[in-house]
């Protein structure tokens, strides 16, 4: 099931209560802690979704800087992006010195690095140290659990960070998510198709991971046996045709009589 931009944004707005608490924790730590933050969890759990939800949180004291991790990324490029934001603010307030610009305005730059698993371990360590020495900078890495374990094994950086792990959906939340998808996307799954048996089947197959649930709906869309609405519609059409033929036949019999 391919999702368009609007559908992706709609899915990004599905934030269950336990994930709302993670978002609140994220906001609290950005405000009150200098520690680097790591959003972690398995592929498809919704790490980038939480990052999107954070960016939807408007705070006049924050400037977001989103960087997508890739193998070409280096410290100079990140520092250049950081300085670009400072000079953008400087152009709006030329009376302030560059060195004290964000301190005087009480602004923080929140550096968001999605897909940080592509970064070299030494680069992650360097970014953490850079953030510690820059009081206006907060940094958030997005990593899978495996990437956290692998990179921590090589550079031991986890003790310098605060981990925020995204939980899997519970079975009731899986049901809510399916209902949400049926209303917000172009999936053939209708709200009325969702029942206990379907929820149980999808939950067991996906482990409550939203990305896997979305992928599972592609099977649903491509397999008519799952689509009770389509079957009901076909049966209804066949029934109407049969009724019309019977009525026509009875009329012909009566006419000949």
Predicted regions and their residues:
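Helix-loop-helix "sensor" segment of P-loop NTPases
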Residues: 148-200, 218, 222-227
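C-terminal alpha-helical "lid" subdomain
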Residues: 3-7, 12, 18, 38, ...
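Walker A/P-loop nucleotide-binding motif
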Residues: 32-51
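Conserved NTP-binding/hydrolysis module of P-loop NTPases
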Residues: 2-10, 62-63, 73-91, 179-182
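N-terminal pre-P-loop "Q-motif" helix
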Residues: 14-26
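Conserved P-loop NTPase "ATPase switch" module shared by AAA+ and STAND
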Residues: 100-123, 127
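Conserved catalytic segments around the Walker B and adjacent sensor/switch elements
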Residues: 36-37, 59-71
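Sensor-1/coupling segment of RecA-like P-loop NTPase cores
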Residues: 40-41, 119, 123, 130-156
């Amino acid at each position: 099931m391919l999702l368009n931009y609007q559908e992706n944004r709609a899915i990004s707005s599905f934030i269950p209560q336990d994930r709302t608490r993670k978002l609140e924790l994220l906001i609290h730590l950005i405000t009150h802690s200098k520690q680097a933050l790591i959003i972690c969890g398995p592929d498809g759990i919704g790490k980038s979704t939480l990052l999107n939800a954070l960016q939807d949180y408007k705070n006049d004291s924050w400037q977001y800087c989103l960087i997508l991790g890739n193998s070409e990324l280096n410290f100079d490029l990140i520092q250049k992006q950081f300085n670009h934001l400072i000079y953008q603010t400087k152009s709006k307030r030329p009376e302030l010195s560059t060195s004290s610009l964000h301190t005087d305005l009480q602004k923080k730059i929140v550096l968001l690095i999605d897909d940080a698993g592509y970064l070299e371990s030494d680069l992650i360590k360097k970014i953490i140290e850079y953030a510690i020495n820059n009081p206006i900078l907060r940094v958030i890495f997005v990593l899978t659990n495996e990437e956290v374990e692998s990179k921590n094994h090589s550079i031991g950086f986890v003790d310098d960070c605060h981990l925020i792990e995204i939980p899997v959906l519970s079975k009731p939340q899986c049901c809510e998510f399916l209902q949400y998808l049926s209303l917000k996307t172009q999936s053939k799954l209708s709200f009325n198709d969702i029942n206990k048996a379907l929820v149980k089947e999808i939950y067991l197959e996906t482990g409550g991971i939203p990305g896997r649930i979305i992928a599972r709906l592609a099977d649903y869309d491509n397999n008519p046996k799952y689509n009770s609405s389509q079957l009901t519609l076909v049966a209804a059409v066949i029934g109407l045709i049969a009724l019309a033929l019977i009525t026509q036949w009875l009329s012909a019999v009566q006419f000949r009589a």
